[in-house]
Amino acid sequence: MKVRPSVKPICDKCKVIRRKGKVRVICENPKHKQRQG
């Protein structure tokens, strides 16, 4: 899980979603997981 000021999809399978007011990226590749902090 990477915590970044700006989250962007890295590959085609990355999805940007909002969960409890936080922006997250979920993906099949665990290295691509991100959240905004």
UniProtKB/Swiss-Prot annotation:
- Name the domain of life: Bacteria
GO CC term, one of those recorded: ribosome
Offer an example of a GO molecular function term for this protein: structural constituent of ribosome
Which keywords does this Swiss-Prot/TrEMBL entry list? Answer: Ribonucleoprotein, Ribosomal protein
Keyword Ribonucleoprotein included in the entry's annotation: yes
Biological process GO terms, please? translation
Reply yes or no: does the keyword Ribosomal protein apply.
yes
Task: Name the family.
Answer: Belongs to the bacterial ribosomal protein bL36 family.
Q: What is this protein called?
A: Large ribosomal subunit protein bL36
Species assigned in the record: Halothermothrix orenii (strain H 168 / OCM 544 / DSM 9562)
- List the taxonomic lineage: Bacteria, Bacillati, Bacillota, Clostridia, Halanaerobiales
